[in-house]
């Protein structure tokens, strides 16, 4: 549970940094790692939520990439099989998809 809380703190800091420094960038955060009730989880799945989707997705293409997908982990956090598959698939489709392990590493990537 501690890792999830630490990852959430990193994600909140990154989102605030994006809002302050790049307000024009469109982004979306997934609900991954959030604890919900069984009924809410069923609704999320039925409405399209997919296990392993990256924590942050920036809809901001560059000259060489379609956008940026970030899976946030702590120094000791490990990605799931589904998270690894998402990152691999997105990279193969022209996105930059990566795992970052700190606030500093994440903003450097952005």
Task: Please place each PLM-identified region on the residue numbering.
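Catalytic phosphate/metal-binding cores of nucleic-acid and nucleotide-processing enzymes, i.e., regions
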Residues: 1-110
């Amino acid at each position: 549970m501690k890792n999830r809380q630490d990852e959430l703190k990193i994600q909140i800091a990154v989102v605030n940094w994006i809002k302050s420094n790049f307000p024009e960038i469109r982004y979306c955060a997934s609900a991954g790692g959030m604890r919900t009730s069984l009924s809410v989880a069923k609704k999320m799945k039925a409405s399209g939520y997919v296990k392993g989707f990256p924590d942050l997705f920036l809809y901001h293409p560059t000259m060489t990439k379609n956008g940026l997908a970030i899976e946030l982990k702590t120094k000791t956090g490990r990605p799931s099989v589904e998270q690894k598959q998402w990152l691999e698939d997105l990279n193969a489709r022209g996105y930059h998809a990566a795992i970052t392990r700190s606030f500093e590493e994440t903003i450097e990537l952005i």
